[in-house]
Design a protein with these regions (language model features):
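Conserved glycine-rich "GG(E/T)P / GGGxP" loop and the immediately following alpha-helix
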Residues: 1-133
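Accessory C-terminal segments flanking Radical SAM cores
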Residues: 137-178
Length: 178
């Protein structure tokens, strides 16, 4: 029913899409039907899913590397190494990869360390862009403000109208079809 109405199918919303065992099949099916598939992930399951994901070859994979900040005691060096091993391989295969640091105005204190870890795998200089850097062909680092899910109970804006701006030109379908 979506054919002819939309171009892009984004496989993300709430939760980690790489947990779904049929994700690569969904990507292939989307491509066969003429859609442009994009995946957004926190990157923690890339190693386990790399071969099937690379074979499915989505148009773009966005990796929210800022998500690692919430994992106290986790190994950032190992995490970034795994993300970069996957990302450089994917980019070489023609998949656009965006490493997202969407934490401005929040927990951005570790960003310089993360950028140093990325530079171990793709040395600088990088090409500056309005939203970050192009660090190699098909491989980008992007910055943006910290995203906070709308919450009517939030004390700062509980009396205001809460609205997700993405709903102006996007819809989301959860795993249960809602």
């Amino acid at each position: 029913r979506l054919k002819g109405r939309i171009k892009f199918l984004y496989f993300h919303l709430m939760g980690e899409p790489l947990l779904h065992p049929l994700l690569p099949a969904f990507v292939l099916s989307a491509k066969e039907k003429g859609f442009i598939p994009v995946i957004t992930t926190n990157g923690t399951l890339l190693t386990e899913n790399a071969a099937r994901l690379l074979d499915a070859k989505p148009h773009k994979i966005q990796i929210s590397i800022h998500s690692h900040e919430g994992n106290e005691g986790a190994d950032p060096d190992g995490y970034i190494a795994r993300v970069m091993n996957f990302s450089t391989d994917a980019a070489e295969r023609g998949i656009i990869v965006v490493l997202r640091l969407w934490n401005q105005g929040g927990y951005e204190r570790n960003n310089e360390r993360i950028l140093q870890l990325i530079a171990r795998h793709v040395p600088r200089p990088w090409t500056e862009r309005y939203d970050g850097w192009k660090i190699s062909p098909n491989l980008y680092v992007e910055f943006d403000k910290m995203f906070e899910w709308p919450d009517e109970g939030h004390e700062e804006y509980a009396q205001e109208e809460v609205f997700c701006y993405a709903l102006r030109n996007q819809i989301g379908v959860l795993a249960d079809g809602t």
